Amino acid sequence: RKALGIAPDDFVFLFVGQHIWQKNVRFIIEALEKIKDTPFRMFFVGNGYAAEAMKELVAEKGLDKCVTFVGTLTEREAITQYYAAADLFLFPSLYDNAPLVVREAAALHTPAVMIEGATAASILTDNENGFLIPNDLDAFANRLRELIHDPERVHKVGIQASHSIVRSWEDVVGEVLERY
């Protein structure tokens, strides 16, 4: 955290992926606007066609001081620092079916927040190895605020995520061979 300029008591949200509207990144920004009276830091890692519009939206919502756009990171170690520094990994995409980024976050004890019913959310059990929230902006914002104030629970769920979501490549290859 120190290397990234993050104070020890800052609550940190993270998104890693393409900055495209299909990833539901607007939903993240709009939820953050609803909780901007609660201290947090948000890091968007990646790039994409919506990056500039996302930055404009963040400025428009008055979130410039707590939201940082990191850009594309090609060094695995640099990306790992952000995963390790984050308290929660925000992944409200309804578009993805098996995002590796959720497993990468879990490997570093960072639980994901996903939308109930999203295909990718099938790997999570709410409050056990991640957090599932209805596809409703107010519900999403309220849950984020609640989790900011309960870092012990977030940490506990992150530990469980690292045990239940992370899979070895041997397991993945075995499952693919079994299915196909």
Regions found by a protein language model. Name each.
Residues 11-34, 42, 49-55:
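A conserved mid-protein helix/loop that constitutes part of the nucleotide-sugar donor-binding site
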Residues 55-73:
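Nucleotide-activated donor-binding/catalytic signature segment of Leloir-type glycosyltransferases, i.e.
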Residues 72, 80-86:
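Short alpha-helical donor nucleotide-sugar binding micro-motif in glycosyltransferases
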Residues 94:
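Aromatic "clamp/platform" in nucleotide-sugar-dependent glycosyltransferases that forms part
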Residues 111-115:
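Short hydrophobic beta-strand element within catalytic cores of glycosyltransferases
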Residues 126-127, 131-137, 146-151:
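Conserved acidic donor-binding segment of nucleotide-sugar-dependent glycosyltransferases
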Residues 153-167:
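A short, well-ordered alpha-helix in the C-terminal region of glycosyltransferases
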Residues 169-180:
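C-terminal alpha-helical cap of glycosyltransferases
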